[in-house]
C-alpha cells in the first residue's frame, strides 16, 4: 500500500495486470536476479549504490578498460546479481556513462572475492578516495569466463557499445 501511495503521489503508473503485488520481497528478488530495470519500475526510481573508490589490481587499466573499484558504504545495501550493467556514475556534481561489472572476474582468476568495478566511459582522471554513486539502468549480460584475455577484451568493446546505446536511449534527466 505504501508503494501504491507513493506511486500515486509521484504520478507513477504501476501495472497490476499480472496480479503480482509489489513488495520489498519482490524488489529484493528482482535485484538478486539482476532485473534492475524492472525493480526501478516497481520502486519508482532507479536503484543505486553509494561508496568510495578504492585501489584495485590495475588489471582493467592494463587491458584498456580502467575501472573504479567501489567499496559500498552501507554494509546492509543489497548488491544486485553478478553481471555487466549500464549505469550512471555521479561524483563531484557531474554524471557520466558507466559500464559496471559485479562479480568475481573469472577470466582474471580473482578467486571468490566479489568486486564492484565500473569503467567510466570516455573518462581518464584519477578518482581514488572519491565518493561516487552508481545508478543502475539495465543489466546487459551475466558475468562470464572467457578462454583468454583477448576474448575478454573483444567482449568488453561490445559491452561498451551496448552500454552507450542503452544510456543514450535512457537520456539522463
Identify the meaning behind each predicted range:
Residues 12-15, 56-173:
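Phosphate/ribose-recognition catalytic cores of enzymes acting on nucleotide-derived substrates
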Residues 1-66, 147-156, 164:
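Classical nucleotidyltransferase
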Amino acid at each position: 500500500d505504501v508503494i501504491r501511495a507513493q506511486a500515486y503521489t509521484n504520478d507513477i503508473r504501476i501495472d497490476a495486470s499480472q496480479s503480482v503485488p509489489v513488495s520489498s520481497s519482490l524488489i529484493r528478488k528482482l535485484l538478486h536476479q539482476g532485473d534492475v530495470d524492472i525493480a526501478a519500475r516497481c520502486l519508482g526510481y532507479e536503484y543505486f549504490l553509494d561508496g568510495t573508490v578504492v585501489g584495485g589490481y590495475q588489471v582493467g587499466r592494463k587491458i584498456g578498460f580502467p575501472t573504479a573499484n567501489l567499496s559500498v558504504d552501507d554494509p546492509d545495501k543489497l548488491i544486485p546479481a553478478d553481471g555487466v550493467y549500464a549505469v550512471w556514475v555521479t561524483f563531484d556534481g557531474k554524471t557520466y556513462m558507466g559500464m559496471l561489472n559485479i562479480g568475481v572476474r573469472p577470466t582474471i582468476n580473482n578467486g571468490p572475492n566479489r568486486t564492484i568495478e565500473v569503467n567510466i566511459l570516455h573518462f581518464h582522471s584519477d578518482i581514488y578516495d572519491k565518493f561516487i554513486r552508481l545508478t543502475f539502468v539495465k543489466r546487459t549480460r551475466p558475468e562470464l569466463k572467457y578462454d583468454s584475455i583477448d576474448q575478454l577484451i573483444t567482449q568488453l568493446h561490445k559491452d561498451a557499445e551496448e552500454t552507450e546505446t542503452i544510456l543514450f536511449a535512457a537520456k539522463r534527466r
